[in-house]
């Protein structure tokens, strides 16, 4: 069916006392992203013309964190219930648009479920998302008459008979803007909590002869809210299990799906293998036949075909061409670039550095602010000394250079093509093509040398 224009209200004013945190509840992260951001993203994908965020506690931190110019910030200075929260947003509703109500602490709600709810909303009525629970204790019950939804009764206000009802309200609903404003104006706080319940609009709509269509989500977990860290951790595992399942079904070999975390977006080729305890953050692309070893962290990086990243390596904001090998225990920091066939071994760190085709830095090396040519060998313990305490300087190494172990390259410095730098050398001046450079203190031998003896 053809949908009307739609705006979304996200309720995010709660303090989250049971989180025992100074951070507003909705800013606690799931899969590396604030819970409320998951909800905002779902609203955006659904095509919301406007997203109204109702906030209260921690408003400044919310604004600093979300930084979304498209959000309409609505202050709820006092938390007097969900109906009261919606009343604060009501002046922004257009009469001819639908209003979808969501919650900042219900992060797993899917676009697909919301679209079905939107499609099911009757003309002039309400679309209501409900679920059936074996133990509905604490939740508002859906009352029906001859199969039709007639209202919602909060648990504290329910009779013993009503508490036997298993169908409960998730709090997510959609209604026309003009209708919603009219119903909101009629809410009272005559209940056990002394609050204004948005759920009371269901009975108001029913008594006007309006239809209420109940829709169930694809998965109950979509409507699970978070009140404490235990609940958040459970939703994290549910989310990660879903992501792992999608990747397995799309051809990625996860050696242990229960020990894999996706905290962003992963694009991948064919025959990718990922071992246990790998974390993917931000936007990551893995080419064909890429292998990621156990315990690696890959963030905002592009990994080319046939690359292999050995265990416990960290790759952040880096770009690897085809057939590169990394680690184990390597660290590629922002700006690291490896051309085809390059190798970075154990305990090597790169930042703002390019390693040319077929070049190798095998062990215990720091390469920062460096441009390294093709077929270069970087010996163990080599350091580009790029920082003088105030400014960074660049090291340039040409093709086919051999850098011996324990070399210090004091930038700014350029090493020409084919040059050889002997082990233990400190390079402070430019080196010409094909030169041999060495700087060593003369070796001294003292026969019969005795070590000092500790004084008694």
Swiss-Prot record:
Cite the CDD domains for this sequence. GT2_GlmU_N_bac (cd02540), LbH_GlmU_C (cd03353)
User: Where does it live in the cell?
Assistant: Cytoplasm
Q: Which reaction does it catalyse?
A: alpha-D-glucosamine 1-phosphate + acetyl-CoA = N-acetyl-alpha-D-glucosamine 1-phosphate + CoA + H(+); N-acetyl-alpha-D-glucosamine 1-phosphate + UTP + H(+) = UDP-N-acetyl-alpha-D-glucosamine + diphosphate
Question: Which InterPro entries does this chain map to?
Answer: Bifunctional_GlmU, GlmU-like, GlmU_C_LbH, Hexapep, Hexapep_transf_CS, MobA-like_NTP_Trfase, Nucleotide-diphossugar_trans, Trimer_LpxA-like_sf
Presence of the UniProt keyword Transmembrane in the record: no
GO cellular component labels: cytoplasm; membrane
Cofactor (UniProt): Mg(2+)
Disulfide feature: none
Where along this sequence does the record place binding of Mg(2+)? 105, 227
- Chain residue ranges for the region called N-acetyltransferase: 251-456
Q: Where is this region: Linker?
A: 230-250
The record's family statement is: In the N-terminal section; belongs to the N-acetylglucosamine-1-phosphate uridyltransferase family. In the C-terminal section; belongs to the transferase hexapeptide repeat family.
Q: What is this protein called?
A: Bifunctional protein GlmU
Organism of provenance: Salmonella schwarzengrund (strain CVM19633)
Q: What taxonomic classification does the UniProt entry list for its organism? A: Bacteria, Pseudomonadati, Pseudomonadota, Gammaproteobacteria, Enterobacterales
Tell me the gene name: glmU
């Amino acid at each position: 069916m053809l949908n009307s224009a739609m705006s979304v209200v996200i309720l995010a004013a709660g303090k989250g006392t049971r989180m025992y945190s100074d951070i507003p509840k909705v800013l606690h992260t799931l899969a590396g992203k604030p819970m409320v951001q998951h909800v905002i993203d779902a609203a955006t994908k659904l095509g919301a013309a406007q997203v109204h965020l109702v906030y209260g506690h921690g408003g400044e931190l919310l604004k600093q964190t979300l930084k979304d110019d498209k959000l309409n910030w609505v202050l709820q200075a006092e938390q007097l219930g969900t109906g009261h929260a919606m009343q604060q947003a009501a002046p922004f509703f257009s009469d001819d648009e639908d209003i979808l109500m969501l919650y900042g602490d219900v992060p797993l709600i899917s676009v697909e479920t919301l679209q079905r709810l939107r499609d099911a909303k009757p003309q002039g009525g309400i679309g209501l998302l409900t679920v059936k629970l074996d133990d509905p204790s604490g939740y508002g019950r859906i009352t029906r008459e001859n199969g039709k939804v007639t209202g919602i009764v909060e648990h504290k206000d329910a009779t013993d008979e009503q508490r036997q009802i298993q169908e409960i309200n998730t709090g997510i609903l959609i209604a026309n803007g003009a209708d919603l404003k009219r119903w909101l104006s009629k809410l009272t706080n005559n209940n056990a909590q002394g609050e204004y319940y948005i759920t009371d609009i269901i009975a108001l709509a029913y008594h006007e002869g309006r239809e209420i269509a109940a829709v169930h989500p694809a998965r109950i977990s979509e409507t699970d809210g978070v009140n404490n860290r235990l609940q958040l951790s459970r939703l994290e595992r549910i989310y990660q299990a879903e992501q792992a399942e999608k990747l397995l079904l799309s051809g990625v070999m996860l050696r242990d799906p229960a020990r894999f975390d996706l905290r962003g977006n992963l694009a991948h080729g064919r025959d990718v293998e990922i071992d246990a305890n790998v974390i993917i953050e931000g936007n990551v692309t893995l080419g064909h036949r890429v292998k990621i070893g156990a315990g690696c962290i890959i963030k905002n990086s592009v990994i080319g075909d046939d690359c292999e990243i050995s265990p416990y390596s960290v790759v952040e904001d880096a770009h690897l061409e085809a057939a590169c090998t990394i680690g184990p225990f390597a660290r590629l920091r922002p700006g690291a670039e490896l051309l085809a066939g390059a190798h970075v071994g154990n305990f090597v760190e790169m930042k703002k550095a390019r390693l040319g085709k077929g070049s190798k830095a095998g062990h215990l090396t720091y390469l920062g602010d460096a441009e390294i040519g093709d077929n270069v060998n970087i010996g163990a313990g080599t350091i580009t000394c790029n920082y003088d305490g105030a400014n960074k300087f660049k090291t340039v190494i040409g093709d086919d250079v051999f850098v011996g172990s324990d070399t210090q390259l004091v930038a700014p410095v350029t090493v020409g093509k084919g040059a050889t730098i002997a082990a233990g050398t400190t390079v402070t001046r430019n080196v010409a093509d094909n030169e041999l450079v060495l700087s060593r203190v003369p070796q001294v031998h003292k026969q019969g040398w005795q070590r000092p003896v500790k004084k008694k």
